């Protein structure tokens, strides 16, 4: 596509498209192709009343596992020498800022609900954290990271 606009509904539809094309629900698809190769031991997914993963929200993993996904992006789609995402996809994510917004310092970040954050440093470091911040005041940590980059 040419334009991108975030929409929870679009991600739910995408979840159903993955199921239709692959024959696997999105959570199983991600477990076999992404989460298991990343050695993610635990992951939970929010599901709709019909049992399909919502897609837009509700994938729960530990902070260190979230950092592994950042490492995949920093390494051009590979983890421990194994290709998990195509190089073309990773380039598009960074170029078009699909879910990874570009920061003023050249790094990229992805924020989640209630204070989850994944930050990819322009120096090759990956920083991930989860904090309960329903009021959205968690920018202090990001400001400190950017100040010390």
Predicted regions: what is each one?
Residues 1-57:
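Catalytic-site signature segments of enzymes, centered on catalytic residues
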Residues 8, 44, 48-49, 58, ...:
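Solvent-exposed, flexible loop/coil residues
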Residues 10, 22, 26, 30, ...:
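Stable alpha-helical elements in mature extracytoplasmic
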Residues 10-17, 55-78, 116-132:
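Active-site-proximal alpha-helical segments within enzyme catalytic domains
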Residues 16, 25, 35, 49-51, ...:
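Homeobox/homeodomain signature
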Residues 18-23, 48, 61-67, 97-106:
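Short, charged low-complexity intrinsically disordered segments located at boundaries
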Residues 36, 74-149:
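Catalytic loop of the DD-peptidase/beta-lactamase superfamily, centered on the K-T-G motif
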Residues 48-61, 105-115:
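Carbohydrate-binding/catalytic loop surfaces
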């Amino acid at each position: 596509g040419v334009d991108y606009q975030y929409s929870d509904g679009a991600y739910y539809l995408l979840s159903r498209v993955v199921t239709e094309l692959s024959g696997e629900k999105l959570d199983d698809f991600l477990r076999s192709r992404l989460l298991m190769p990343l050695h993610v031991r635990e992951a939970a997914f929010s599901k709709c009343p019909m049992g399909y993963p919502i897609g837009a929200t509700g994938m729960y993993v530990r902070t260190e596992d979230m950092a592994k996904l950042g490492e995949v992006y920093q390494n051009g789609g590979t983890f421990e020498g194994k290709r998990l995402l195509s190089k073309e996809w990773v380039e598009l994510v960074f170029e078009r800022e699909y879910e990874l917004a570009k920061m003023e310092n050249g790094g990229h970040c992805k924020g989640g609900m209630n204070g989850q954050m994944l930050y990819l440093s322009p120096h090759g470091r990956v920083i991930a954290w989860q904090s309960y911040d329903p009021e959205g005041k968690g920018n202090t940590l990001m400001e400190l990271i950017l100040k010390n980059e």
